[in-house]
């Protein structure tokens, strides 16, 4: 079950964290994985690790916020079956403390970046007889996160795009779903703690973990496992749906 043999998958934000875990798992399940990330060095490291595991993988440095670059990337990759829109950035701030520049930056990557990938990928998926799109939303789209105004807004848009795409391209054989993670222990979290709480990283990590009802953060591999299911033939009857993976966060905050 959950095999991706003979499938080609494009994964944005694949250089670290959740995207890296998805790329590694998809490759282990037989897919030819195209890892896309703004950080070329991170891409190459993922490629090395996947090839050491005998996986098929190609790396691409690309800024998803630049439509022309994304279009060229998709054309260069050629026919593919799966698109995972995972690239994104975070920002801390309320509506009145978020600058226009920061708001635009978050929207450019988290919303326009997804749009750019959809715009370039859907014609290829349609021509290929269909495929699967998986967008990375967030619990922030469901409940809003305190002092994450721009991020919550952007992820709400991603969830809306998921619904729209699922409806518009159902007859083309394209399925589209999204995942809404809660807190996930990624290098981003470690970097955030190191920058903001030097010397107190372990203490603050424990505090952040306790904000999750289940008592810990998710691991990237857990999110990747859900992504694999949704992109496999076993999920062929599922489209237009968001899947929280949040340790009970949404249930206890709505």
Language-model region placement:
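Residue(s) in the substrate-gating loop at a strand-loop-helix junction
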Residues: 138
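Active-site helix of classical SDR
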Residues: 118, 154, 162
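Alpha-helical segment proximal to the catalytic Tyr-Lys
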Residues: 123, 167-171, 236
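Substrate-binding pocket helix/loop in short-chain dehydrogenase/reductase
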Residues: 94-95, 99-105, 208
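Conserved glycine-rich cofactor-binding loop
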Residues: 8, 15-17
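Short C-terminal tail/terminal secondary-structure segment
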Residues: 143, 228, 239-254
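C-terminal helical subdomain
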Residues: 66, 178, 186, 200-234, ...
């Amino acid at each position: 079950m959950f095999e991706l043999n003979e499938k080609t998958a494009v994964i944005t934000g694949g250089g670290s964290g959740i995207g890296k875990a998805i790329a590694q798992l998809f490759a282990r399940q037989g897919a030819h994985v195209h890892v896309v990330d703004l950080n070329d060095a991170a891409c190459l490291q993922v490629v090395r690790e996947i090839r050491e595991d005998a996986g098929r993988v190609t790396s691409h440095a690309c800024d998803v916020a630049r439509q022309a670059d994304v279009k060229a990337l998709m054309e260069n990759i050629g026919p593919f079956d799966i698109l995972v829109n995972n690239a994104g950035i975070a920002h801390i701030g309320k509506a009145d403390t978020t600058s226009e520049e920061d708001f635009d930056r978050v929207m450019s990557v988290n919303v326009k970046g997804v749009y750019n990938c959809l715009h370039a990928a859907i014609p290829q998926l349609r021509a290929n007889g269909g495929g699967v799109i998986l967008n990375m939303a967030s619990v922030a789209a469901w409940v809003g996160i305190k002092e994450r105004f721009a991020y919550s807004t952007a992820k709400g848009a991603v969830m809306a795009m998921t619904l729209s795409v699922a409806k518009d391209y159902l007859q083309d054989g394209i399925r589209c779903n999204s995942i809404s993670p809660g807190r996930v222990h990624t290098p981003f979290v470690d970097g955030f703690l190191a920058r903001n709480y030097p010397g107190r990283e372990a203490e603050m990590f424990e505090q952040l973990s306790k904000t999750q009802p289940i008592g810990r953060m998710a691991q990237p591999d857990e999110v990747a496992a859900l992504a694999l299911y949704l992109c496999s033939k076993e999920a062929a009857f599922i489209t237009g749906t968001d899947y929280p993976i949040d340790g009970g966060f949404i249930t206890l905050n709505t």
